[in-house]
Amino acid sequence: MLQLLLAVFIGGGTGSVARWMLSMRFNPLHQAIPIGTLTANLLGAFIIGMGFAWFNRMTHIDPMWKVLITTGFCGGLTTFSTFSAEVVFLLQEGRFGWALLNVLINLLGSFAMTALAFWLFSAAAAR
């Protein structure tokens, strides 16, 4: 149990630092759509889709790796709270179209990335 807790801790810390770095680097690129947050959410969705496809196929892999990558890293990398706050800020500024676009891109994009990664890695593992 301690090993699993440490895996979540290390993965979560690493994912959080990665999200912060993406936000610092890419959020200033667009005034209405926080590109860093979007990138973190889409990348996390892709990684978790890939991870679930991989771990479903490779049942012999230590469960510690699954929680390190999915619960830890992806949990730290992706962020619903920051995304929600950024949408609220856009709404407060009266930028309703940008707020709606941000919601649609994050939600639909995340679903699409998870499905794409799961499909790609399931197909690759089947070969």
Swiss-Prot record:
Record's subcellular location: Cell inner membrane
Gene Ontology CC entries for this record: plasma membrane
Activity modulation notes: Na(+) is not transported, but it plays an essential structural role and its presence is essential for fluoride channel function.
Keyword Coiled coil set for record: no
UniProt-annotated binding residues for Na(+): 75, 78
TM region(s), chain numbering: 4-24, 35-55, 71-91, 103-123
Annotated membrane topology: Multi-pass membrane protein
Top-level division of the source organism's lineage: Bacteria
Catalytic reactions on record: fluoride(in) = fluoride(out)
Function recorded in the entry: Fluoride-specific ion channel. Important for reducing fluoride concentration in the cell, thus reducing its toxicity.
Family: Belongs to the fluoride channel Fluc/FEX (TC 1.A.43) family.
HAMAP family listed in its UniProt record: FluC
Protein name: Fluoride-specific ion channel FluC
Native source organism of the sequence: Salmonella typhimurium (strain LT2 / SGSC1412 / ATCC 700720)
UniProt lineage: Bacteria, Pseudomonadati, Pseudomonadota, Gammaproteobacteria, Enterobacterales
Gene for this chain: fluC
